[in-house]
């Protein structure tokens, strides 16, 4: 009998990650058991509204949580099979300099305002690859040219404030990709950019990802952006992943009421004239989270057990998971439990 091939090892795997913060009003959990994985060469979109824990998740991966107010209570983070969450922060920072890179929301604060952009990129090559000043500068100019900065040799001498928002974000992308990372984390990379520039930046990220064969985690609340670039999607709500799976499966047959609510709350070209249905209520306060399923106070299909029993992620189809007691009903669109007490 021929043994089955070994399962492919994810490039990044996060399991049961719990992160707490100490604030002026008390201690609260920003992440409550987050689990997901990213395979080499794929794009995972982490989708959710503001405050769902998307950015905290990736900052935990990058070891960028504030030291004095945040702490990881439990969970593991593995990169290429190595458990980096158990290693000193220095090891994670080493990986973030060479293997994992991040594009932040605000390009202006991501760059040093008093250092020329070419010098900021060249410094990466000098420190990490021990290149000469001349060669490092040439690499920096080539990187700016690669991301579409016109007249890159001249613009490399400019300071961040001399670039428009869209061009400044291209500089940040050039810096992130300078050392050819295997994983790029893009945290709301088009925030504060106009619609046309947003599309240009997302097209650029997609082209560069395909050219370099790297994996990408895209943090966003925009369903349209996810549909354009992602292979898989993880939906977050109240500090946990409530659904994950292949993009088309999650979009075509969402298995969690929150995901279905997101789909029904935005216009869809294939449903002209369809009335939009907002999700009722507000996200829970992290200081006073609900018992049971975190979505039950807003859920149209909640039953009594949803108020007491927290559902775990379970498989509903190949590669498709949802944290809902009634995932099958939600997937088929049959509201058999709506209004049940």
Please report, for each region that a protein language model flagged, where it lies by residue.
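P-loop NTP-binding/switch modules centered on Walker-like glycine-rich loops
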Residues: 63, 185-189, 193-274
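Conserved ABC transporter NBD signature motif
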Residues: 72-83
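A short, proline-enriched helix->beta-strand linker immediately N-terminal to the Walker B motif
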Residues: 178-182
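Short catalytic/signature loops enriched in Gly
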Residues: 4-10, 150-154, 244-341
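The feature captures the beta-strand-to-loop junction immediately N-terminal to the Walker
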Residues: 47-49
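A short, flexible loop at the N-terminus of ABC-type nucleotide-binding domains that lies
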Residues: 7-11, 20-33, 64-70, 87-92, ...
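Conserved ABC ATPase "signature" region
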Residues: 82-83, 135-154, 263-264
């Amino acid at each position: 009998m021929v043994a089955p091939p070994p399962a492919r090892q994810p490039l990044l795997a996060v399991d049961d990650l719990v992160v707490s913060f100490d604030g002026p009003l008390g201690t609260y959990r920003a992440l409550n058991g987050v689990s997901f994985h990213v395979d080499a060469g794929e794009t995972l979109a982490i989708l959710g509204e503001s405050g769902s824990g998307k950015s905290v998740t990736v900052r935990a991966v990058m070891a960028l949580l504030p030291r004095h107010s945040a702490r990881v209570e439990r969970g593991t983070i593995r990169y290429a099979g190595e458990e980096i969450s158990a290693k000193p922060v220095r090891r994670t920072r080493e990986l973030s300099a060479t293997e994992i890179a991040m594009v932040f929301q605000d390009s202006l604060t991501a760059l040093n305002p008093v250092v020329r952009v070419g010098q900021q990129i060249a410094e990466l090559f000098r420190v990490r690859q021990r290149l000469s000043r001349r060669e490092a500068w040439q690499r920096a100019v080539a990187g700016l040219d690669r991301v579409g900065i016109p007249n890159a040799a001249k613009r490399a001498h400019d300071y961040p404030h001399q670039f428009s928002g869209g061009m400044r974000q291209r500089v940040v992308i050039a810096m992130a990709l300078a050392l050819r990372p295997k994983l790029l984390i893009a945290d709301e990379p088009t925030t504060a950019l106009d619609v046309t520039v947003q599309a240009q930046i997302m097209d650029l990220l997609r082209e560069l990802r395909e050219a370099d064969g790297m994996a990408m985690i895209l943090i966003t609340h925009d369903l349209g952006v996810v549909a354009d670039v992602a292979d898989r999607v993880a939906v977050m709500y109240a500090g946990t992943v409530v659904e994950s799976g292949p993009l088309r499966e999650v979009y075509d047959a969402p298995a969690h009421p929150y995901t279905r609510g997101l789909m029904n709350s935005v216009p869809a070209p294939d449903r002209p004239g369809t009335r939009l249905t907002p999700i009722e209520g507000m996200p829970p306060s992290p200081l006073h989270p609900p018992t049971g399923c975190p979505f039950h106070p807003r859920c149209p299909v909640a039953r009594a057990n949803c108020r007491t029993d927290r559902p775990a992620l379970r498989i509903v189809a190949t590669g498709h998971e949802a944290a809902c007691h009634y995932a099958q009903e939600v997937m088929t669109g049959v509201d058999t439990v709506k209004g049940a007490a």
